[in-house]
Design a protein with these regions (language model features):
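Short hydrophobic/charged patches on amphipathic alpha-helices used for structural packing
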Residues: 93, 332-335
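Extended catalytic-interface subdomain
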Residues: 184-191, 204, 210-211, 240-290
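A general structural motif
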Residues: 319-331, 351-354, 425-428
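A short acidic, Gly/Pro-enriched loop at the edge of an enzyme's catalytic core
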Residues: 100
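PLD/PLD-like phosphodiesterase catalytic module centered on the HKD motif
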Residues: 2-93, 97, 115-209, 213, ...
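Active-site cores of enzymes that catalyze phosphoryl transfer or operate on phosphate-rich substrates
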Residues: 41-86, 252, 264-330
Length: 440
């Protein structure tokens, strides 16, 4: 029994019978960095009929994960792995144009010149008047250039203008931890350190693509990421619920004669964050915890035993008064398998910056570990202007420190490179993930 872990923040945790290890560099997970408190969110997943067919170590993992996150049972054919950014983009457009009832997209931002994608969304809305479009992006990133230049917000505002906010619901999440004088003096390229909307959820009807890719040109052409297409109504509903919950804690884009403005709807589930941060965090905790706990099953069960269990786990640290995020407990539980001799770990990260608890599990474990990271020439910040240009070397330094601490032939680090980023035929690397194989 192999273990596969990917994240779109929120992310699913897979337990799968068999998956091809050659696809590891397509797998991804985002790790929350820094020290913080967390508490598990317990759920009732019911009995798994083929529980005893799993590896004994896997059974122990299933029991613990069942106390953290809802479990979704999938069978062969319910998951399609997309390997190339062009395939991801073409698949997304194809799904959108065939939509029958809903399109829901969560991303950090949409590239400000992605006119083709906006036209595809518009065509789908024109073609089928029953479709509802929901978009969730980060407010700071999506209005960075406004009002003096084009931005994500100005790009997608015409969809609201044409189809109305009852059909096109565009939400912009604003971190509760940056407002007032602090926001006015913080450079726009640095304000992300206070928090942002980083989910990448691309759902159409009863299918959902989970990825680490934003909706912009490099992610559609020459930035290697990971893309998982889930053909599951229940899982799609779950992620639609996640997006809906965060949207209810976000601003709504409203069009005006001057372009657009951000409004806080009266039916939102919290007051504006800058008015009372503590109250906002209490409200957002009340809204999000049930979403993490709840699983609504609508699909008809079959006699076929599932070969893959999916546990969606999430990081909502900035929105919890007492952090109830589920991703770190899940990752650490999986990494406890490294204590068994004969276990294997493959990990990949575009940016080498390992959480201290994860690093501790790797260094003290008995497993053979292989880590794939971006070479400096595959780092999107390579030769960029300003302080960000120092980041590739900083990640190399972090990697060297890690290797000095490891001091073991059981830990191997590989650098991914395909040409030189920002030059002809050069790619960047953005995949992040974990794959643990238990012994036996």
């Amino acid at each position: 029994m192999d273990f596969l872990k990917i994240q779109t923040n929120p992310l699913p945790f897979f337990l799968a019978e068999s998956l091809n290890p050659d696809s590891m560099n397509r797998i991804a997970a985002f790790f929350a960095h820094g020290k913080r408190r967390f508490s598990s969110v317990k759920v009732d997943n019911g009995t798994l009929e083929n529980y005893h067919s799993f590896n004994p170590l896997v059974r122990g993992t299933i029991q613990q994960l069942d106390s953290i996150a809802p479990r979704f049972a999938l069978k062969k054919g319910d998951i399609e792995i997309l390997n190339h950014p062009v395939t991801f983009y073409e698949t997304l457009k194809e799904k959108i144009l065939k939509a029958e009832k809903r399109i829901f997209l969560s991303s950090l931002y949409i590239g400000k010149h992605e006119d083709e994608l906006v036209k595809v969304l518009d065509d789908a809305l024109v073609k089928n008047p029953n479709i509802k479009l929901d978009i969730l992006v980060d407010a700071l990133r999506s209005t960075r250039e406004a009002p003096h230049s084009d931005s994500t917000a100005s790009l997608i505002a015409p969809l609201v203008e044409k189809h109305g906010k009852h059909r096109v619901n565009i939400r912009l999440y604003h971190t509760p931890h940056l407002h007032g004088w602090r926001e006015s003096i913080t450079p726009k390229r640095l304000n992300e350190i206070y928090g942002l909307q980083h989910m990448k959820i691309y759902g159409v009807d009863d299918e959902v693509i989970l990825s680490g890719a934003n909706l912009s040109r490099d992610y559609f052409t020459n930035r290697q990421d990971r893309y998982y297409l889930f053909k599951s109504k229940d899982l799609s509903n779950y992620y639609h619920g996640i997006q809906t919950a965060v949207s209810s804690l976000s601003y709504q884009l409203i069009t005006s004669s001057r372009g657009f403005f951000l409004d806080w709807p009266t039916d939102n589930n919290a007051s504006e964050p800058h008015l009372n941060v503590e109250r906002f965090l209490s409200d957002s905790t009340r809204v999000l915890v049930p979403v993490l706990r709840t699983k609504k099953v609508e699909t008809t069960t079959t006699n076929e035993d599932p070969d893959t269990l999916v546990y969606p786990v999430s990081s909502f640290a900035p929105l919890f008064k007492d952090d109830k995020s589920t991703e770190l407990p899940c990752v650490l539980r999986m990494l406890s398998l490294l204590d068994h001799k004969g276990a294997k770990l493959t990990m990949t990260a575009g940016y080498f910056n390992i959480h201290p608890k994860i690093k501790e599990r790797i260094l003290r474990g008995q497993a053979c570990s292989e880590i794939i990271t971006a070479s400096p020439e595959a780092n999107s910040f390579y030769l960029s202007k300003g302080i960000s240009g120092l980041l590739p070397d900083a990640y190399v330094y972090s990697c060297e420190k890690f290797m000095n601490e490891a001091n073991s032939s059981a830990v191997k680090v590989l650098e991914w490179q395909n040409g030189v980023v920002n030059t002809p035929n050069g790619w960047s690397y953005h995949a992040k993930g974990l794959w643990v194989t238990p012994p036996g």
